[in-house]
Amino acid sequence: MKRDDLIFDIIEKEHQRQLKGIELIASENFVSDQVMQAMGSCLTNKYAEGYPGKRYYGGCEVVDQSEQIAIDRLKQIFGAEWANVQPHSGAQANAAVFLAVLNPGDKFMGLNLAHGGHLSHGSLVNTSGIIYTPCEYNLNKETGRVDYDQMEEIALREKPKMIIGGGSAYSREWDYKRMREIADKVGAILMIDMAHPAGLIAAGLLDNPVKYAHIVTSTTHKTLRGPRGGVIMMGKDFPNPWGKKTPKGEIKMMSQLLDSAVFPGIQGGPLEHVIAAKAVAFGECLQPEYKEYQTQVKKNAAVLAQALIDRGFTIVSGGTDNHSMLVDLRTKYPDLTGKVAEKALVAADITVNKNMVPFDSRSAFQTSGIRLGTPAITTRGAKEDLMLEIAEMIETVLSNVDNEEVIAQVRARVNETMKKYPIFAY
């Protein structure tokens, strides 16, 4: 076959973009060479519908081994009794939990998307909000933190069948214990989506929801620093509370419902090359350098947030406990939208994403905020001193969004600075 130079030239362009720029998108990271090698391996050739030891195809005895290693390592990292590593993404993992727990039209609670929630937690344009009935809880307007008292009031009033914790733009620790107490009061299943802070949790730097929640989902990229994919876990398996039975009349365990929801519920064949890459990444999580890396992620985020605050920016909730922060632009730049801010920063090779902020008057296409995170830049070896420089460059760009000369100067500075940092330092 002739080499597809068109696509490989594009891949090289993307490689150069990643090398030259400062990556601050909170959900992005750089994986190790061995994770990429597993992703590009011959395992991509193998169909393996089903689970290890119970497949619908022959010749699965080898991929059974790699998938079982992924399961065992994931359980070891988070102290889970049961895990499923087959979901193709975090949203797929969430969809599988919905399928296992809810019937169409059933009510559930999730964090308001504009307050830092996620599309798959009840957005009306997502299957979670189309098939099921969402109700929202919010951040406290004064503190910018989850209002657990309001959450309890809403739960007692609405009686949801499931309560979801976790989000895509929330920089504070979650009170999983309080959430479990609320869920137990109303007889709800507590599902925690820890996609964003999973790596920090794996390193023991944030509280572990597996100890409290009925079910935990996550992506395997972001802070966890693996290939793009999803997982589902339970700290302890339990009989399903709705009395669903096997053909033999035995009460099904929750793990059986979840396994069936993933396959054949929402997926067919698993991506065994991705699962092998997940296993490699989980192995990296168990190495001592991983905790060093995650500790630096947290330090860098705290320093970047404070440096921005010192320059007059508003950070929702006043700071960060994890890898991310949500910058409310309205205080410092009342007329600047997140869309324009993102475009200007990207032009300077500082990659961020526009994001709605709590009580935002602008649409999701314009927004009044930008979301920042430190996982990717920390993987490259950045320390606190670079965070101070980044805060300065962000302010320079956002104060000159229409000045192409200033943006070009910042871009040149970014490109020169990043020559000192390899793509993967930890």
From Swiss-Prot:
Q: Which reaction does it catalyse?
A: (6R)-5,10-methylene-5,6,7,8-tetrahydrofolate + glycine + H2O = (6S)-5,6,7,8-tetrahydrofolate + L-serine
The Swiss-Prot or TrEMBL record annotates one GO molecular function as: pyridoxal phosphate binding
Q: Does the keyword Transferase apply?
A: yes
Q: Where in the cell is it found?
A: Cytoplasm
Which pathway does it operate in?
One-carbon metabolism; tetrahydrofolate interconversion; Amino-acid biosynthesis; glycine biosynthesis; glycine from L-serine: step 1/1
- What domain of life does the native source organism fall in? Bacteria
Q: Where does (6S)-5,6,7,8-tetrahydrofolate bind?
A: 113, 117-119, 363-365
Q: EC number(s) of the enzyme?
A: 2.1.2.1
N6-(pyridoxal phosphate)lysine modification sites? Answer: 222
What are the GO BP annotations of this UniProt entry?
A: glycine biosynthetic process from serine; tetrahydrofolate interconversion
Listed GO CC annotations = cytosol
Function as written in the Swiss-Prot or TrEMBL entry:
Catalyzes the reversible interconversion of serine and glycine with tetrahydrofolate (THF) serving as the one-carbon carrier. This reaction serves as the major source of one-carbon groups required for the biosynthesis of purines, thymidylate, methionine, and other important biomolecules. Also exhibits THF-independent aldolase activity toward beta-hydroxyamino acids, producing glycine and aldehydes, via a retro-aldol mechanism.
**Do you know which HAMAP family this protein is assigned to?**
SHMT (MF_00051)
Sequence similarity: Belongs to the SHMT family.
What is the annotated quaternary arrangement, including any partners? Homodimer.
Protein name, entry field = Serine hydroxymethyltransferase
Species of origin reads Phocaeicola vulgatus (strain ATCC 8482 / DSM 1447 / JCM 5826 / CCUG 4940 / NBRC 14291 / NCTC 11154)
